[in-house]
Curated annotation (Swiss-Prot):
It is found in: Cytoplasm. Catalyzes the attachment of proline to tRNA(Pro) in a two-step reaction: proline is first activated by ATP to form Pro-AMP and then transferred to the acceptor end of tRNA(Pro). Consists of three domains: the N-terminal catalytic domain, the anticodon-binding domain and the C-terminal extension. It catalyses: tRNA(Pro) + L-proline + ATP = L-prolyl-tRNA(Pro) + AMP + diphosphate. InterPro entries: aa-tRNA-synt_IIb (IPR002314), aa-tRNA-synth_II (IPR006195), aa-tRNA-synth_II/BPL/LPL (IPR045864), Anticodon-bd (IPR004154), Anticodon-bd_dom_sf (IPR036621), Pro-tRNA-ligase_IIa (IPR002316), Pro-tRNA-ligase_IIa_arc-type (IPR004499), Pro-tRNA_ligase_II_C (IPR016061). Its EC number is 6.1.1.15. The lineage of its organism: Bacteria, Bacillati, Bacillota, Bacilli, Bacillales. The keyword Aminoacyl-tRNA synthetase applies. Keywords: Aminoacyl-tRNA synthetase, ATP-binding, Cytoplasm, Ligase, Nucleotide-binding, Protein biosynthesis. This is Proline--tRNA ligase 2. Belongs to the class-II aminoacyl-tRNA synthetase family. ProS type 3 subfamily.
Length: 476
């Protein structure tokens, strides 16, 4: 049975999309629901999200943000107040038209995002500069009626956090926007072991209604980019539309400066596609629901289960640990926990007990070592950190190996046709060139990185003077 289970995973080299689907199903992260595009987060998948949420929530509270909750319904008239915003989301909006059998006087939108609700609220509670800043965060689900869906990456309903803040000055709102982007980047790198590129979105790719959008981009196993998190500076675009004013220090009315930012369960899709392999899920230790699994060998023999339980009591002081004392074979268990991506497996049987040791196996490298039982409390935390570093370094090496430089149109064509990954190239800043590259090569601008490189004098597309180096790529 174990063999059949492993063989059920399609190899990523053969069909990456099917490989991904196999993993999310076989690792019991999600199940499909009866509503197209909606997923059921199973206990293991939800525990993974909870661990991510816990870290993020603590970091936001440490920086002065407060959690709130807004309604899930938005009146159509409220959504219409910011023109660019509503146009950007209109195709994805789900509408409620009836309450019971009664037709509603006004359609209600099921929130695709909550800017308009926060704006309405802010306009009621802010009068003076003494009321600023307001630093709010919301954990909720949102609905976007997507045409093509895939678990975690693009679903009709998904879980996320969305932050909304208002400030006295443009400088404060810009600082907030970039501070949050840095928080997201450090979370990805320090907890998910995913290396990211920080940068600004082009006008074409920025959030509907924003003055500027900043992003963290990561590279998946198949060479496609994933926008892992975004932070938006709205300037006064929304505050003018919603009349969010305050009396400044000179007694004059001013519009607030506003930000919005968010990350979602899409991050789980990212960590699957960055770290996992043809044997199943590989989880970064810091967010893994279970960090260590103990598999008793010949558990029917006297003393084996007792010793496994004793080890669990010691290890749970330093890691999230479970014992599998079920009557399934050790081979089945090995494959099961390999599939679920548990970072460390410990095997303990009669011979190990005699030698006062355990067999320790790493999920990421399959390396095996013998560890004295009295050293486990020390060895396990150190090894979990080693695994995190190894996963990060491996992902960064992959990204670097699959990042290419193009200095002219023909070079870009050759790379786009033959390779998968990021393409660094210069750009003049014109929308026409951005759209032509998308049309010709299927690549979009991922970001204008903060760390700029001067690769050439001319735009990759039109030959005019270049203004920015841009990361281009095919993306989810």
């Amino acid at each position: 049975m174990a063999k059949e289970q492993v063989q059920a995973i399609t190899k990523m080299e053969e069909d990456f999309a099917q490989w991904y689907t196999d993993i999310v199903k076989k690792a019991e992260l999600v199940d499909y629901s009866s509503v197209k595009g909606c997923m059921i987060l199973r206990p293991y998948g939800y525990a993974l999200w909870e661990n991510m949420q816990k870290v993020m929530d603590e970091k936001l509270k440490e920086t002065g943000h407060e959690n709130v909750y807004m309604p899930m319904f938005i009146p159509e008239s409220l959504l219409q107040k910011e023109k660019d915003h509503v146009e950007g989301f209109a195709p994805e909006v789900a509408w409620v038209t009836h309450g019971g059998d009664e037709k509603l006087a006004e359609r209600l939108c099921v929130r695709p995002t909550s800017e308009t609700l926060f704006c309405e609220h802010f306009s009621k509670i802010v009068q003076s500069y003494n009321d600023l800043p307001k630093l709010y965060n919301q954990w909720c689900s949102v609905v976007r009626w997507e045409k093509t869906t895939r678990p975690f990456l693009r679903t009709t309903e998904f879980l996320w956090q969305e932050g909304h803040t208002i400030h006295e000055t443009a400088e404060e709102s810009q600082a907030e926007t970039l501070n949050i982007l840095n928080l997201y980047a450090s979370f990805c790198e320090d907890y998910l072991a995913i290396p990211v590129i920080k940068g600004q979105k082009t006008e074409k790719e920025k959030f509907a209604g924003a003055k500027a959008t900043y992003t963290i981009e990561s590279l998946m196993h198949d060479g496609k980019a994933l926008q892992t998190g975004t932070s938006h500076n709205f300037g006064t675009n929304f505050s003018e539309a919603f009349d969010i004013k305050f009396l400044d220090r000179n007694g004059k009315w001013q519009y607030v400066h506003q930000t919005s930012w968010g990350v979602s369960t899409r991050m789980i899709g990212g960590l699957i596609m960055v770290h996992s392999d043809n044997n199943g899920l590989v989880l970064p230790p810091k967010v893994a629901p279970v960090q260590v699994v103990i598999v008793p060998i010949a558990q029917h023999k006297e003393g084996v289960l007792a010793k496994a339980t004793e080890l669990q009591a010691h290890i749970q002081k330093v890691a999230r640990v479970k014992i599998d004392a079920s009557n399934k074979t050790p081979g089945w268990k090995f494959n099961e926990y390999e599939m679920k991506g548990i970072p460390i497996r410990l095997e303990v049987g009669p011979k190990d007990i005699e030698k006062n040791q355990v067999v320790l196996v790493r999920r990421d490298t399959k390396e095996k070592e013998f560890v004295p039982m009295d050293q486990l409390e020390e060895r396990i935390p150190a090894l979990l950190e080693e695994i995190h570093i190894a996963l990060f370094n491996k992902a960064k090496a992959f990204r670097d190996e699959n990042t290419y430089v193009a200095t002219n149109f023909e070079e870009m064509k050759k790379i786009a046709d033959e390779k998968q990954g990021f393409i660094k190239a210069m750009w003049c800043g014109e929308l026409a060139c951005e759209e032509k590259l998308k049309e010709e090569f299927g690549v979009s601008s991922r970001c204008m990185p903060f760390e700029q490189e001067h690769l050439a004098e001319e735009c990759i597309c039109c030959g005019k003077e270049a203004k920015q180096m841009v990361y281009w790529g095919k993306a989810y």
